[in-house]
From Swiss-Prot:
Belongs to the DMRL synthase family. It holds the Pfam family DMRL_synthase. Homopentamer. SUPFAM superfamilies: Lumazine synthase. This is 6,7-dimethyl-8-ribityllumazine synthase 1. It is an enzyme of class 2 (transferase). One of its GO terms (cellular component) is riboflavin synthase complex. It comes from the Bacteria. (2S)-2-hydroxy-3-oxobutyl phosphate binds at D92, T93, R134. Its EC number is 2.5.1.78. The gene is ribH1. Catalyzes the formation of 6,7-dimethyl-8-ribityllumazine by condensation of 5-amino-6-(D-ribitylamino)uracil with 3,4-dihydroxy-2-butanone 4-phosphate. This is the penultimate step in the biosynthesis of riboflavin.
Length: 164
């Protein structure tokens, strides 16, 4: 299988042209733009196609992925995988922990229990500076990393013959 690399680690491309759904949270618009830029660039570089759905915040991302899976079961678009993009920056309340933990848990549950290929690009940071370091394509490129992770999971699912 052809590989793509980032930071010296191989990413595997799916055999067939993959079609993904990017679900992006717009709570921090500028950071969302940077994450989306990285994700779409990585998918285009890999020859994948994608749709984008925007949600208010990261906590809504898992629900939209579930809506898409339910829609596919009813004859709607069948996505090979998903890219979750958002930024959660710690504030003065417990809300950060709830959003970070619950969005991550829900994505992991779908991935493990339902064999859903998800690249998790939801940043959880202490401040804006950390978020920008991770979001910018010229630095951390976590949007691109999440897209390549989703593609790798699609390829591994194909390779291992996992259920759809």
């Amino acid at each position: 299988m052809a590989g793509i690399s980032q930071h010296g680690k191989a990413f595997i491309r799916p055999k067939a042209k993959a079609h993904l759904l990017i679900v992006e949270a717009r709570f921090h618009d500028d950071l969302a733009d940077a994450l989306l830029d990285g994700a779409t660039s990585a998918l285009e570089e890999a020859g994948a196609t994608y749709d984008v759905v925007t949600v208010p915040g990261s906590l809504e991302i898992p629900a939209v992925i579930t809506f898409a899976l339910d829609g596919a079961a009813e004859g709607g678009t069948n996505y090979d995988g998903f890219v979750a993009l958002g930024t959660i920056i710690r504030g003065d309340t417990y809300h950060f922990d709830i959003v970070a933990n619950e969005s991550s848990r829900a994505l992991m549950d779908m991935s493990v229990q339902d064999s859903v290929c998800i690249g998790n690009g939801i940043l959880t940071t202490e401040n804006d500076a950390q978020a920008w370091t991770r979001a910018k394509r010229s630095e951390g490129d976590k949007g691109g990393f999440a897209a390549r992770a989703a593609l790798t999971m699609i390829a591994l699912k194909e390779q291992l013959g996992a259920r759809s």
